[in-house]
Amino acid sequence: MKKISMVIVAISAMISLSGCHEDPTYVDSYFQRQSVIEELSNELKGQYSSIFIPVIYNASQEQMDYKSLWKGEVTENGQPIIHYTFGGYENRTVTLQQVPISWISFVIKDIKLAEAVKLLPDYDISIPYSFASSDEETGEASKMGKIIYSDSKVPVTLNYGGKQHLVLFNFKCPSQFVFDADKRPISPGRIQLELKSIIVDNVIVQEINGYLGGECFLSIMGKTDPISK
């Protein structure tokens, strides 16, 4: 009886393993392999520049004239240029350099908070990135992948209303750039950065959703061009 029980357990285990192998959700993705992640991230590593396109509306849906406020480098026709850096395997983040977060003041409803934010210097914003298959059903046979950017929070300390406050700007980066791993070199593509909420002392004081006709703070970095590798 004991031997029969052991045989049944062994057969059940074999069936279970066989089922896992056939189920595509258990197939090891090409883009989950450490060697692939290391190779792709080190290939992306370097300095890039891009056209910077802010789309900023206040509650009255008036677009901000950002070109007159931009203090940095511009193209021949006056479009702002932003620089950013992709870290390699050891630091898989993209750092947007000298982002004018003081412009967020144009969409803030709290007047005192808006006045304090308007005085902020430019900030570097770091966004973690990762790789994934763009077609999960094909499993490891597919080398079509995508770059995924994670959310990022920018903390600042501000004095307003007679008190010191910890303010968090919560950014979302919905961009997902699809690429073929067999075609090199890969490029980061367009990066889109959206302000989703403003948090003061651990309390959400304002949510930003331009799609509902409210305030909007959206920055689009156009096609990327490497300036050094």
What residues fall within each predicted segment?
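Bacterial Sec-dependent N-terminal signal peptides
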Residues: A13-E43
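Tryptophan-anchored aromatic micro-motifs
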Residues: S41-D65
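Edge/loop elements at the starts and ends of beta-strands within beta-rich repeat scaffolds
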Residues: S41-K45, I147, R184-I191
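Positively charged n-region of N-terminal signal peptides that target proteins for export
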Residues: M1-I4
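Predominantly extracellular/secreted and cell-surface proteins with exposed
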Residues: P80, Y84-F179
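Generic short beta-strand segments
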Residues: S49-N58, S150-T157, Q192-V203
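Surface-exposed strand-loop-strand hairpins of Gram-negative outer-membrane beta-barrel proteins
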Residues: S60-E76, Y84, G88
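Edge beta-strand at a domain terminus
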Residues: P24-Q32, Q164-K229
